Amino acid sequence: MEPILSAGRANGGADLVKDTDINGFMTDVIEASRQVPVIVDFWAPWCGPCRQLGPALERAVRDAGGAVRMVKINIDENPEIAQQMRIQSIPAVFAFRNGRPVDGFVGAIPE
């Protein structure tokens, strides 16, 4: 996997941090990653490390000023995507670029 640009979020009304589901995955992740890298956060509401990591990722996205977008996927509500991506532990974070995953990690990591 090749390295990805640091996380970022632009202002101006664009949906740069958003939730998606099986119906929006192709547009929100695959197609969007052809324009700008997309960080995908696989999480669940009962996951303590997910609740810690999510806000830290969102801050990093905002701080990078539009370099990337972030999409959050609740694995309890979207088991099909989790299965397709072979998610076995959460939090699991993948960076997509040009329509494919290029980097990722599993578990909460310190800022």
Predicted regions, residues:
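Proteins that catalyze or organize thiol-disulfide redox chemistry
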Residues: 1-66, 79-80, 84-86, 90-92, ...
